[in-house]
Amino acid sequence: MTTSHASHPDRLLPADPGTRDIARRLLAHVEDLPIISPHGHLEASMFVKDEAFPDPTSLLISPDHYLTRMMHSAGVDLADLRVGGHEGKSAREAWRIFMSHWDLYAGTATGYWVEQEFEHVFGINAERLNVGTPEHADAIFDELTDILAKPDFRPRALAEQFNLEVLATTDDPLDDLADHKALADDPTFSPRVLPTFRPDAYTKMYNAGWAEKTTKLIDTAGDGKAGWEGYLQAMRNRRQYFINHGATSADHGLHDTDTTPLSHKDAQKILDKGLAGTATLAEMHAFEANTTYRFAEMSQEDGLVMTIHPGVYRNHSASAQKKFGADIGADIPFQMEFTNGLRPLLSDFGENKDLISDSSFNRWLRTVSLGSTQDADMAAASNLAANSKMARQNTRDILDAVSDGGVMLGRNGALVLGPVVGTLHIKFIAPLNKRVERVMYKTGLSEAAAAEQCALEDRLREEMAHALYQWNPGRDENYDLVINTGSMTYEQIVDLVVETYARKYPLHVRIIPNGKDQ
């Protein structure tokens, strides 16, 4: 019987007993749900070929730069770990090296992850990792080799066992996405494998091969246009191609947060210099900043979610990159400034209601600024500043709360529900039978299971409010307005909210009849 902490049901849960109890219930609520992975680096071809993994080293060590860079920092040659296709050492010898250096991973997230793999995927006691002799390493290597040869450990079978529902890959804009299509057309494979548009190779002039790749992009997808116009057209076309193959997002690994746009003339000038190999480093970064801005612009048009992760010096070791290739663990973060860098992008696109979404917790505990020094900044309904983007957003906020039950708190919550000027605290009570019906419809649960889920959500919400904000959301006297949403139409509820705010703060709101400015 295993005694490894990796098998303990409370691993990683809080030490405080009361908080741990809440965490246990939260975990029980979600741990068996399907996996929806919006970002990853697996290849779609893995599931098309569905081949057995060759050996433990090729699967678990050589491609994992979190593992290899730790050993490299202790003097292990990456070639001995078979990184970048090097085969100086056998897979078995590389495994022995890993096992003999296991002490390096004590207390690290990487070590914890490997222990979880051993315990919960392979069924091997993780404590056996602590014995690093060659004989012991060989025994585990042979066990894993036998396990990986089983049909249950091929990519498709693992995807089903892990309850993988959606997996987003990361793909070059010129990828033909044939493997994604093959999977989408295969009725025997239930997970959805979606491509993600990753244009970094065409935005970073300072990377090797940029000019050749960019020329090919324009020639292939630019609709016959040249230069900067061809570049933009090619990107639009390939984004649409990805969307047609199921893509929902575009992923951008940025050098920094600069999003300053360039004029067409300046962009063309830098593009020409980049293709000729004469652009300065400052011009290269300006070009990348401009493309980030343009991709945000495109996201407003085609709906691809834009994800960015800036502030990492990729492939910091030039010698390691030359010998082993890119992405082998030589990435180093550097200090970032977000406010000024993202300002051009957010100034032009940040008010778009579809650009930034919020969490389900925020949909319950609203931090909507219901009121300020400006006229109609409350903007909660169509008869208040009908053309205001804030009006539309606050209207959606109220609709969410009406549908799900919960609380809307003005002026960043005013967390203690105190008498802060300009706030309005509202509680919506969604009838339990309606909530249960909604859960049954969305999840397919039975009525009893749906009712249990609603009850659990209510308990967790109340406990979270107590733990985080020291207040009881169930006490109606804490609110300016309490509404049973089953007794009124949505329009009536919005009107009541607006009227209540107008009565409480008559100087803050100007009622605009029929939604027209006067």
Curated annotation (Swiss-Prot):
Superkingdom of the organism of origin: Bacteria
Biological classification of the source: Bacteria, Bacillati, Actinomycetota, Actinomycetes, Mycobacteriales
EC category name: isomerase
Name of the protein this chain belongs to: Uronate isomerase
EC number of this enzyme: 5.3.1.12
Reaction catalysis annotation: D-glucuronate = D-fructuronate; aldehydo-D-galacturonate = keto-D-tagaturonate
NCBIfam families xref list: PRK02925.1
GO molecular function: glucuronate isomerase activity
Pathway involvement of the protein, from the record: Carbohydrate metabolism; pentose and glucuronate interconversion
Organism annotation: Corynebacterium glutamicum (strain ATCC 13032 / DSM 20300 / JCM 1318 / BCRC 11384 / CCUG 27702 / LMG 3730 / NBRC 12168 / NCIMB 10025 / NRRL B-2784 / 534)
UniProt KW keywords: Isomerase
Bilayer-spanning residue ranges: none
GO annotation terms (biological process): D-galacturonate catabolic process; D-glucuronate catabolic process
Family under the similarity heading: Belongs to the metallo-dependent hydrolases superfamily. Uronate isomerase family.
InterPro entries: Metal_Hydrolase, P-loop_NTPase, Uronate_isomerase
